[in-house]
Amino acid sequence: MPRNDQFNNSHPLDDYIEQQQLNNLDNNSNVSLANQNTVLDDFQQQFSDKEMQKIESISQQIKPLDNDGLLSYGSHLQENMSKFSHKMLDEVQTKDIGPVGDSLNQLMTKLKAVNPDELNPEKQSKLKRFFKRTKASINEVFSRMQSVSSQIDRITIQLDRHKNNLSKDIKLLDGLYQQNKDYFDDVNLYIAAAKRRKHEIQTNDIPKLQEHANQTGNQMDIQAVADMEQFVDRLDKRIYDLQLSRQIAIQTAPQIRMIQNVNQALAEKIQSSILTSIPLWKNQMAIALTLMRQRNAVSAQRAVTDTTNDLLTQNAAMLKQNAIETATENERGIVDIETLKTTQSDIIETIEQTLQIQQNGRQKRKEAEKELVGLEDELKQHLLSMKKE
C-alpha cells in the first residue's frame, strides 16, 4: 500500500509495515541464530530505546506453554479496535450529508430564480417587451426577489447549522484518527514483543529442551519439545492476527481522512456560499434594481420634457389661431351687407306676398257677395211661387 502523508503521521515502523504487512514467519523451530539476530537488529533500528523497553516489558507477558495467556495476549487492543470500528460505523450511519447537498442545490436554484437581465428591457425578447410593460416587469421581479431573498435567508440558517455540525464531525474524526493511531502504535509494540518472545523461545528455550531430550531420550522430554514448538506455532498465529488488526488500522486511517476531507470541502463550500455567493447575489440584485430605477427616472424625466414641449407647441398653435380669428372678427361690421340685402329682399317679398293675399281676398269676397245675392233672389222666387200656389 503506498504511503499517503496526508493520512498517516510519520512513525518508526512505517517502512517496516509497508515492506512486511503480513510477514509469514518461518515455522521451522530450527531457524538459524543469524537470521533471528537480524530480526532483533531490525527492531532496534525501527524502535527507539523507550519503545524497546516497552517491548521488553510486554514480551514478558508471554509465558511459554501458557495457552490461555497467549489467547488473551493483545486481546484488549482488539476489543478496543472493535469498539472503535463500531463507533466509526455509528458515525457514518448517523451523519447523513445528503441534506447538506440538498440545501446547497436549493440555494443554487433560488439564486437562479431571479435574473437581473429581466430588469433590462434591452436584454428581453421583443415578444416579452410587447406583452409586458416595463413597470409591471420591475414590480414582478422585485416581488419575486423579496420572496427569494427570504427563502435564501432560511436556507442560510440551515447551511450554517450544517456547517457547525460538519465542524463538530471533523473534530470528532480527529479524535477517532488519534485513537486509531494510538491503537496502531500499541499493536506494533505487541507484535514486536511477540516476535521478540518468539525469538527468545526459538533461540533459547527450544534448543535447551532439545538438548535435554537428546541427553535423556525420555519421551516426555521429547513431547516437551513438541509442545514448545506447537506453542511457537500458536504464537505465530497470534502474531498474524495482530498483524491483520494492524492492517485494519492502516486502512482505517486514510478512510477517516477521506471522510474528513469531504466534510471539510462541504464546510468550505457552505462558508463560501454564506460569505460570498449570497452577499454577491444580493449586491447584484440591489445594483440591478438601482440601475433600473435610474433608467425609469430618466424615462420619466424624458416624458415630462416631451409633454412640456408638446404643451408649449399646442398652446402656441392655439394662441396663433385665436389671434387670427379675433383680428378677423374685429374687422367685420356689426351687420354684414349680405345680411342686410337678404333681410331687405325677404321684407319686400313678404310685403308683395301680403298685398297679393289681400287682393285675392277682396276678389273672393266680391265673388261671394254676388253668389249670396243670387242665392237670395233664388230663394225669394221660390217663396213667391209657393204663395201663388
Swiss-Prot record:
It holds the Pfam family TelA. InterPro entries: Toxic_anion-R_TelA. Belongs to the TelA family. This is TelA-like protein SH1505. The lineage of its organism: Bacteria, Bacillati, Bacillota, Bacilli, Bacillales.
